[in-house]
From Swiss-Prot:
It comes from Ralstonia nicotianae (strain ATCC BAA-1114 / GMI1000) (Ralstonia solanacearum). This is DNA-directed RNA polymerase subunit beta. GO terms for cellular component: DNA-directed RNA polymerase complex. GO terms for molecular function: DNA binding; DNA-directed RNA polymerase activity; ribonucleoside binding. Keywords: DNA-directed RNA polymerase, Nucleotidyltransferase, Transcription, Transferase. Its EC number is 2.7.7.6. It catalyses: RNA(n) + a ribonucleoside 5'-triphosphate = RNA(n+1) + diphosphate. The RNAP catalytic core consists of 2 alpha, 1 beta, 1 beta' and 1 omega subunit. When a sigma factor is associated with the core the holoenzyme is formed, which can initiate transcription. The gene is rpoB. PANTHER family: DNA-DIRECTED RNA POLYMERASE I SUBUNIT 2. InterPro entries: DNA-dir_RNA_pol_bsu_ext_1_sf, DNA-dir_RNA_pol_bsu_external_1, DNA-dir_RNA_pol_su2, DNA-dir_RNAP_su2_dom, DNA-dir_RNAP_su2_hyb_sf, RNA_pol_bsu_bac, RNA_pol_bsu_CS, RNA_pol_bsu_protrusion. Pfam families: RNA_pol_Rpb2_1 (PF04563), RNA_pol_Rpb2_2 (PF04561), RNA_pol_Rpb2_3 (PF04565), RNA_pol_Rpb2_45 (PF10385), RNA_pol_Rpb2_6 (PF00562), RNA_pol_Rpb2_7 (PF04560). GO terms for biological process: DNA-templated transcription. It comes from the Bacteria. Belongs to the RNA polymerase beta chain family.
C-alpha cells in the first residue's frame, strides 16, 4: 500500500482484525452538500433542479395582479462574488455573504383585449443577501463563526397511534390517526370512549367524522357502503330468508334453530356455530337460511328504501329496523332489504353510530359546520365557505405534503405508487379513516413515533429554503398589491419588488434562530461534532419540558445512524444527538447507514446504504461475525438483527443478507476516538466522548500513543490540518505560507500552476483558544493531493492530539487524590506540557457624542508617563507589549459637559489652555485578573475620517503580504514559461536576434543563458510555428502581469475604502492579547474514559513516586476511581501505552547505537506485522525507515479501533517485546510487566505492593481555575435590595445563604453574623460608615437597618397591610 507524505513519517500500528471495505465518508458532507443543493451556485440555469432557491422561486412566481392583466414571471437567479473573504469578514465583523439577483419578467396584457400582450419588461432585481458557507461547513455572521444544526423532526405523512389506555379510566385503547403535512393544517381523527369517530383540524373543536365525509361529497348511503359489508334479506309474511355467508356465522351463538334447505336442523338454538356446522350447511348446498322476525329487529338498514309506486322514502339508510318499520315495508310490497353486518369482534358499528350523532343534512350543511368550527362568529357566505374548505387541504398555496409526505402517505395506506399530488385527495382522507377503523377492529399495527423511518432530518439547506420562502411570500403580497398600478404608472420590476422582507427573514434565521448556534471551536473535534449534531429541539420540533422518556431513549433504528453514546448530560439528554460515523442522509432526509451485501453466506464488496424502513426487510449480521479468508461466514449460527423490531437473534449463515461495514459504525466521531470503548460503562463512555470536546489545545500537541485510527480522519476533515489540494513540489516555506509548484498533469491549462497556502497564525477561536498552523514540509519535498502539509491546533503530524501522554501511577498518595483529585508532578508544569495559549479580544470604539467626538489619542491628562509607555504616537499599544491588569492599551478621551469651575480650575485653564477639564479619560484598560502579550491590533476607521499613522501602517503591512503572494505566483509562472520556451527554442534555426545573432544559426543553451530573459522574445525563429508559440507565451505572461496588477489594485481599494461601522462610530480598535495559562491546582483534567478530576497539588519531582531506574511518575491517580465507575478501558490503555513507551525506548537505544537499517526493519517487523493489520514496511527506503524510527523513539503509536481493538494476549505480547527480561529487571517490573515496584520520593522506601504504572493520554479541559477565581472588595449593588450582585461577570460577591447563617448561629458567632447581614450586605449607611472608620483608623462597626427589611415592609404594604416601624 502507498503511504501518504505524513503517514510514512509515523505509522500507527493497528490491531484491527477486519480490513476496511468502506472508507469513513467526509465528516462534514451533510452540511456542505445540503447548502450546495440549496444554492445550486455552479449549476447552469437549465440544469437547476427544483430544490432550494429555485424551488422557492418556482413556488411563488408567477405573481398575477388582482385584475389579471399584469403578471410577473421568474426567469433565473444568480449569486455575485462575495465582496469580502472569510478572514476579512471575521476581522471587520461582517457577514460572509453574496448578493442574490433574480431576473424577472413583467408581462402586461391589453385592457381591451386581455388575451393580447401589450408589453414585456425584463430586468434583474436585487433580492437580498444570502450568507455563504465556508469551506469547513460554518457561516460567518457579523464576524463570528456559527453553525446551523440539523433538526430531527416528525416526518410529514400519516400516523396511527393509540393512547396506551391512559385517557379513559377503564384503560380502553383509544385509536387515533393524524395527517401531518410539511406546511398547512393538521388533520386528526380520533375515537372517543364510546367508539364514536371524530375529526379535528389544527387541534380545534372535534366534530363527527361523517361531517368531513359529507363535505367531500359522500351521502350517508355511500359512507356506509365504504365501511360495512351488507347482509341481504328477502322479507316473507313472517320472518325472512337470509343469504348464507359462512364466514359471518362462524363463532356466533345461534339465536334460533338453523335448518338446511331440506328442513333438517343443523344447529340447535343457543349453540355456538363451529366449523363442522358450516361444512354441513355448505355440503347441503344451503344458499338461504330462514330467520325469525326478532332476528331482524334492531338491525340497521344499509340503504334508503323507497316506495316503488309513490317514490316516498319509507326508511333512511342507518335507520334501525323496528316492528313498525317492517310492517310499513311489507305494506308497501318491499321484498329485498340490506342491513349492515356488524359483530363485537372485528366488525364494529362505529361509523353507523357516528352517523347517528351527526345532524348535518347534506354537503353544504357539512361545509358550513366546518366553517363555523374554523371561524367562529363569522357569518358563513357560500363563497367564503367554499374558499375556506378548498384552502384547508386542496390548495397548493396553503397546503403542501411535500415529496416525503406523499411517499409516506402512499406507503402507509398500502399503495404501490410513490408519487402523487402534493395536496390531500378525497381518497387519502377516506383510506386513512378506513385504516383507522380497521385498527379499532383489531387489524393492523399502530406506528412507532420514535422509529427513524418516521423522523427525518432537516438540514441547513432545507431550513434556509423555508426561511427564504417565507420572506418571498411576504414580497409576493406587496407585489400583488402594486401590480395593478404597473401599467398606469409605467413601473419597472425593481419598482415593485422590495428585498427587505427576504433579507430580514434570512438575517433573523442565521442570526437568532434556535438552530443557529455559536460554533464550539475549543478544538478540532468540537467543531466537527457541532456540525454533525442533530437536535430534536427548535422551531417545529420538541421542547425540553414536554419531551418524555420514549423520545429520548435509544431506539433499535438508531443503529449505525445516530450515536447511542454521545448526548449531553442534563435536561437535553437524548434530544440532542450526534450522527454516527458512517451515516448519511438520503434524498428524502431519512438517515441511512451502509451495509455490505452477503450472498449465499459469502461477503461481497457491494456496499448499500439502507434507511431504517428498508433495513426492516433484511437480516443484518454484526461486523464481528467470523469470516474466512475468502469472505465466507463460517459459524453455524451468526448473531443478526431481523424484523421491524430489529431484535438480535442467532440465525443460520444462509439467511444473512447484509453485514455491518465496520464495528465502529454504531458510534459517532467523538465516541470512536475512545480506545477500548468496549470495556467502558456506557455512562462513563458518554462523559469521555463529551469531555474530549472540551480539551484545550496545548502549546505542543502530542499524539495519543494509544488511539483508534480515527484521529487522522477527524484532523483532516475538520479543516484544522492543511491538506494539499493538488500534488506538486514544495517551492517555498516559511512560518506563514507554503508555496507549491503544481504537477503538470494536475495543472489546468491557462491557469497559474501554483498553490499558495496562507497559514492561520495565532488567531482567536470562538472559545478564545488559540488557532495556529505550522508547516510540516521542507523546500524540495514532493507532496501528493490530499497530503497534510501543515499542522493546526491540537494536531500532530496530521493526527488529532487533544492532550498529552503522561506516565500515570494508580495509587493513593497522602489523600491528595481523594475523591478523583489528581496529583501532578512539577516537571509537567516546568516542561510546559499543559500550557495553553488563550487569545482575548479587547475592543474600544470612539463615537460621536452630543458634546463632540471621542478621540483616540496618547495625549491624556492626569496620567503618568509610565502608564503611557506602551502606547505609540496614535495612542494604541505596540505589538509585543507585555501588559498587566489595569494597564492602558488604547488611550481615549471623551468630552464631558460644562460644569461650574472652581477658582483653582479656572487658574489651571488660564495657564494650560482649554484642554484640562473638558474631557474625561475613558481609555481601554486590561480587565482585572488578565495579563498577557499584545499580538495583534486592528484599527477600523469610518469612511471620510482621516486615518492615523497606525491604521496606515497596518494597511501597508497587509498590502506587502499580498504583493509577496502575487510575486511568488508570477515568479513560478514565468519560471515555468521560460523553461518551456528553452525546450522549444534550443536547436531551432533563426532568422536573426539580439546580440548580432546571424541568420541561419541554431540556438544553444549557452546563448539563451547569456541573454536577458525578456530579450528571448526578440529572437526571430525561421519556423513560423515556433514564432507563433513564442508570441503566445509572451502574450500569456503579459496578460498574467496585467491580471496580477488588477488583483493588487482591487485589494488596495478594498483596504483603503472606509470600514462599515455601526452608526455613530468614528473609529474602532481591536487589541488581541495572548494569555499563557499554565497548569495549576483547581484546573480540571480528564482521560478519555470519563475519568475526570481536579488538580489538587503540584508536587516537586523529588517527592513523586519513582521507579527503580529513577524515572518519576508524572501523575498519580486514585485506584478507587476505577471499580465503581466500571471504566476499565483506562487500565487497558495504561498497559498498552506502557508497551508503546517501552518500544519507543528500545528504538531510541538502537538509534543511539547507530544500528543498521536492516536491524531496525527487523524490530519494526516484529512490532507491526505479527498481529493485526499488516504494514508494508518494504515500500519504505532506508532513509525513510530511519526517519520513521526517529519519530517513534518517544513511543510507538497504536490504534485499537472501537469494538475491534487489541486483545489481552496482544497487549501482553507488546509488553514482552518492549521490556525484555534485562530491561524489566532494571526497571523493577513484575513478571506480568503490568506493574512496577515504586519508591516513595520522600523517604526512598519501596511501597508495600507493586503499582499499576503506564502511559495514559490525559486532557486539560476548558474549565480553568483562572476563569473562575474571583474576589471582590467593593462593586456594584442590586437596585432594589441594595445587596451585592452575584457572579464573576458582574464583579459580584459571595452569596452568604440560609445554611451559612445557621452555621454561624450554631457557633454563636453573633458579631460575625451581624457584620455579614448588615455592613457586608445591604446596610447602605453602615457601609459608608465602615469606610469612613477605616480611613480614620478606627476599626469599629455601626450596624444599621438592612435595606432588605425595608423591601419586606414595602412588600407587606403591597398586600394592603399597614406596617410601620416603631422607633424609640
Amino acid at each position: 500500500m502507498a503511504y501518504s507524505f505524513t503517514e510514512k513519517k509515523r505509522i500507527r500500528k493497528s490491531f484491527a482484525k477486519r480490513a476496511t471495505v468502506h472508507q469513513v465518508p467526509f465528516l462534514l458532507a451533510t452540511q456542505i452538500q445540503s447548502y450546495a443543493q440549496f444554492l445550486q451556485e455552479h449549476a447552469s440555469v437549465a440544469q437547476r433542479k427544483s430544490e432550494g432557491l429555485q424551488a422557492a422561486f418556482n413556488a411563488i412566481f408567477p405573481i398575477v395582479s388582482h385584475n389579471g392583466l399584469a403578471r410577473m414571471e421568474f426567469v433565473s437567479y444568480h449569486l455575485s462574488n462575495p465582496p469580502f473573504d472569510v478572514k476579512e469578514c471575521q476581522q471587520r465583523g461582517l457577514t460572509f455573504h453574496s448578493a442574490l439577483r433574480a431576473k424577472v419578467r413583467l408581462i402586461i396584457n391589453d385592457r381591451e383585449n386581455p388575451t393580447k400582450v401589450k408589453e414585456i419588461k425584463e430586468q434583474e432585481v436585487y433580492m437580498g443577501e444570502i450568507p455563504l458557507m465556508t469551506s469547513t461547513g460554518s457561516f460567518v455572521i457579523n464576524g463570528t463563526e456559527r453553525v446551523i444544526v440539523s433538526q430531527l423532526h416528525r416526518s410529514p405523512g400519516v400516523f396511527f397511534e393509540h393512547d396506551k389506555g391512559k385517557t379513559h379510566s377503564s384503560g380502553k385503547l383509544l385509536f387515533s390517526a393524524r395527517i401531518i403535512p410539511y406546511r398547512g393544517s393538521w388533520l386528526d381523527f380520533e375515537f372517543d370512549p364510546k367508539d364514536i369517530l371524530y375529526f379535528r383540524v389544527d387541534r380545534r373543536r372535534k366534530m363527527p367524522v361523517t361531517i368531513l365525509l359529507k363535505s367531500i361529497g359522500l351521502t350517508p348511503e355511500q359512507i356506509l357502503a365504504h365501511f360495512f359489508v351488507f347482509d341481504n334479506f328477502t322479507l316473507k309474511s313472517d320472518g325472512a330468508l337470509m343469504e348464507f355467508v359462512p364466514e359471518r356465522l362462524r363463532g356466533e351463538v345461534a339465536r334460533f334453530d338453523i335448518s338446511d334447505k331440506n328442513g333438517k336442523v343443523v344447529v340447535e338454538k343457543d349453540k355456538r356455530i363451529n366449523a363442522k356446522h358450516i361444512r354441513d350447511l355448505d355440503a347441503a348446498g344451503t344458499k338461504l337460511i330462514s330467520v325469525p322476525e326478532d332476528y331482524l329487529l334492531g338491525r340497521v338498514l344499509a340503504k334508503n328504501i323507497v316506495d316503488p309506486d309513490t317514490g316516498e322514502v319509507l326508511a333512511n339508510a342507518n335507520d334501525e329496523l323496528t316492528e313498525g318499520v317492517l310492517e310499513k315495508l311489507r305494506d308497501a310490497g318491499v321484498k329485498e332489504i340490506q342491513t349492515l353486518y356488524t359483530n363485537d369482534l372485528d366488525q364494529g358499528p362505529y361509523m353507523s353510530q357516528t352517523l347517528r350523532t351527526d345532524d348535518t343534512v347534506d354537503q353544504t350543511a357539512a361545509r358550513i359546520a366546518i366553517y363555523r368550527m374554523m371561524r367562529p362568529g363569522e357569518p358563513p357566505t357560500e363563497d367564503a365557505v367554499e374558499a375556506l374548505f378548498q384552502r384547508l387541504f386542496y390548495s397548493e398555496d396553503s397546503y403542501d405534503l411535500s415529496r416525503v409526505g406523499r411517499m409516506k402517505v402512499n406507503s402507509r395506506l398500502n399503495r404501490s405508487e410513490g408519487t402523487g399530488p402534493m395536496v390531500l385527495t378525497d381518497d387519502d382522507i377516506l383510506d386513512t379513516i378506513k385504516l383507522l377503523v380497521n385498527l379499532r377492529n383489531g387489524k393492523g399495527e399502530v406506528d412507532d413515533i420514535d422509529h427513524l423511518g418516521n423522523r427525518r432530518v432537516r438540514c441547513v439547506g432545507e431550513l434556509a429554503e423555508n426561511q427564504f420562502r417565507a420572506g418571498l411570500s411576504r414580497v409576493e403580497r406587496a407585489v400583488k398589491e402594486r401590480l395593478g398600478q404597473a401599467e398606469t404608472e409605467n413601473l419597472m420590476p425593481h419598482d415593485l419588488i422590495n428585498s427587505k422582507p427576504i433579507s430580514s427573514a434570512i438575517r433573523e434565521f442565521f442570526g437568532s434562530s434556535q438552530l443557529s448556534q455559536f460554533m464550539d471551536q475549543t478544538n478540532p473535534l468540537s467543531e466537527v461534532t457541532h456540525k454533525r449534531r442533530i437536535s430534536a429541539l427548535g422551531p417545529g420540533g420538541l421542547t425540553r419540558e414536554r419531551a418524555g422518556f420514549e423520545v429520548r431513549d435509544v431506539h433499535p433504528t438508531h443503529y449505525g445512524r445516530v450515536c447511542p453514546i454521545e448526548t449531553p448530560e442534563g435536561p437535553n439528554i437524548g434530544l440532542i444527538n450526534s450522527l454516527a460515523l458512517y451515516a448519511q442522509l438520503n434524498d428524502y432526509g431519512f438517515l441511512e447507514t451502509p451495509y455490505r451485501k452477503v450472498e449465499n453466506s459469502k461477503l461481497t464488496d457491494q456496499v448499500d446504504y439502507l434507511s431504517a424502513i428498508e433495513e426492516g426487510k433484511y437480516v443484518v449480521a454484526q461486523a464481528n461475525a467470523t469470516v474466512d479468508k475468502d469472505g465466507n461466514l463460517v459459524d453455524e449460527l451468526v448473531s443478526a438483527r431481523e424484523g421491524s423490531e430489529r431484535e438480535t437473534r442467532m440465525v443460520t449463515p444462509d439467511r444473512v443478507q447484509y453485514i455491518d461495514v465496520a464495528p465502529s459504525q454504531i458510534v459517532s466521531a467523538a465516541a470512536s476516538l475512545v480506545p477500548f470503548l468496549e470495556h467502558d460503562d456506557a455512562n462513563r463512555a458518554l462523559m469521555g466522548a463529551n469531555m474530549q470536546r472540551q480539551a484545550v489545545p496545548c502549546l505542543r500537541a502530542d499524539k495519543p500513543l494509544v488511539g483508534t485510527g480515527v484521529e487522522r480522519t477527524v484532523a483532516v476533515d475538520s479543516g484544522t490540518a492543511v491538506q494539499a489540494t493538488r500534488g506538486g513540489l514544495v517551492d517555498y516555506v516559511d512560518a506563514n505560507r507554503v508555496v507549491i509548484r503544481v504537477n503538470d498533469d494536475e495543472a489546468v491549462a491557462g491557469e497559474v500552476g501554483v498553490d499558495i497556502y496562507n497559514l492561520i497564525k495565532y488567531t482567536r477561536s470562538n472559545q478564545n483558544t488559540n488557532i495556529n498552523q505550522r508547516p510540516m514540509v521542507k523546500v524540495g519535498d514532493i507532496v501528493a493531493r490530499g497530503d497534510v502539509i501543515a499542522d493546526g491546533a491540537s494536531t500532530d503530524l496530521g493526527e488529532l492530539a487533544l492532550g498529552q501522554n503522561m506516565l500515570v501511577a494508580f495509587m493513593p498518595w497522602n489523600g491528595y487524590n481523594f475523591e478523583d483529585s489528581i496529583l501532578i508532578s512539577e516537571r509537567v508544569v516546568a516542561e510546559d506540557r499543559y500550557t495553553s495559549i488563550h487569545i482575548e479580544e479587547l475592543s474600544v470604539v470612539a463615537r460621536d457624542t452630543k458634546l463632540g467626538p471621542e478621540e483616540i489619542t496618547r495625549d491624556i491628562s492626569n496620567l503618568a508617563e509610565a502608564q503611557l509607555a506602551r502606547l505609540d504616537e496614535s495612542g494604541i499599544t505596540y505589538i509585543g507589549a507585555e501588559v498587566e491588569a489595569g494597564d492602558v492599551m488604547v488611550g481615549k478621551v471623551t468630552p464631558k459637559g460644562e460644569t461650574q469651575l472652581t477658582p483653582e480650575e479656572k487658574l489651571l485653564r488660564a495657564i494650560f489652555g482649554e484642554k484640562a477639564s473638558d474631557v474625561k479619560d475613558t481609555s481601554l484598560r486590561v480587565p482585572s485578573g488578565m495579563s498577557g502579550t499584545v499580538i495583534d491590533v486592528q484599527v477600523f476607521t469610518r469612511e471620510g475620517v482621516t486615518r492615523d499613522k497606525r491604521a496606515q501602517s497596518i494597511i501597508d503591512e497587509e498590502l506587502k503580504r499580498y504583493r509577496l503572494d502575487l510575486n511568488d505566483q508570477l515568479r513560478i509562472v514565468e519560471g515555468d514559461a521560460f523553461q518551456r520556451l528553452e525546450r522549444l527554442l534550443v536547436g531551432k534555426v533563426v532568422n536573426g536576434g539580439p546580440k548580432k545573432l546571424a541568420k541561419g544559426t541554431a540556438l544553444t543553451k549557452e546563448y539563451l543563458a547569456d541573454l536577458d530573459k525578456w530579450h528571448w522574445f526578440d529572437i526571430r525563429p525561421s519556423d513560423d510555428d515556433v514564432a507563433t508559440q513564442l508570441e503566445a507565451v509572451k502574450e500569456a505572461i503579459e496578460q498574467k502581469r496585467h491580471d496580477f496588477d488588477l488583483a493588487f489594485e482591487e485589494k488596495r481599494k478594498k483596504l483603503t475604502q472606509g470600514d462599515e461601522l455601526p452608526p455613530g462610530v468614528i473609529k474602532m480598535v481591536k487589541v488581541y492579547l495572548a494569555v499563557k495559562r499554565r497548569l495549576q491546582p483547581g484546573d480540571k483534567m480528564a482521560g478519555r474514559h470519563g475519568n475526570k478530576g481536579v488538580v489538587s497539588k503540584i508536587t516537586p519531582i523529588e517527592d513523586m513516586p519513582y521507579m527503580a531506574d529513577g524515572t518519576p511518575a508524572d501523575i498519580v491517580l486514585n485506584p478507587l476511581g476505577v471499580p465503581s465507575r466500571m471504566n476499565v478501558g483506562q487500565i487497558l490503555e495504561t498497559h498498552l501505552g506502557w508497551a508503546a513507551r517501552g518500544l519507543g525506548e528500545r528504538i531510541g537505544n538502537m538509534l543511539k547505537a547507530q544500528a543498521k537499517a536492516a536491524e531496525m526493519r527487523k524490530l519494526l517487523g516484529q512490532i507491526y506485522n505479527e498481529s493485526g493489520k499488516v504494514e508494508d514496511l518494504d515500500s519504505l527506503s532506508d532513509a525513510e525507515v530511519l526517519e520513521l524510527a526517529e519519530n517513534l523513539k518517544k513511543g510507538v503509536p497504536f490504534a485499537t479501533p472501537v469494538f475491534d481493538g487489541a486483545h489481552e494476549d496482544e497487549i501482553r505480547r507488546m509488553l514482552d517485546l518492549a521490556y525484555p527480561e534485562d530491561i524489566a529487571k532494571e526497571k523493577g517490573l513484575t513478571a506480568s510487566k503490568q506493574q512496577v515496584t515504586l519508591f516513595d520520593g520522600r523517604t526512598g522506601e519501596a511501597f508495600e505492593r507493586p503499582v499499576t504504572l503506564g502511559v495514559m493520554h490525559m486532557l486539560k479541559l476548558h474549565h480553568l481555575v483562572d476563569d473562575k477565581m474571583h474576589a471582590r472588595s467593593t462593586g456594584p449593588y442590586s437596585l432594589v435590595t441594595q445587596q451585592p450582585l452575584g457572579g464573576k461577570a458582574q464583579f459580584g460577591g459571595q452569596r452568604f445563604g440560609e445554611m451559612e447563617v445557621w452555621a454561624l448561629e450554631a457557633y454563636g458567632a453573633s458579631y460575625v453574623l451581624q457584620e455579614m447581614l448588615t455592613v457586608k450586605s445591604d446596610d447602605v449607611n453602615g457601609r459608608t460608615k465602615v469606610y469612613e472608620n477605616i480611613v480614620k483608623g478606627e476599626h469599629s462597626i455601626d450596624a444599621g437597618m438592612p435595606e432588605s427589611f425595608n423591601v419586606l415592609v414595602k412588600e407587606i404594604r403591597s398586600l394592603g397591610i399597614d406596617i410601620d416601624l416603631e422607633r424609640n
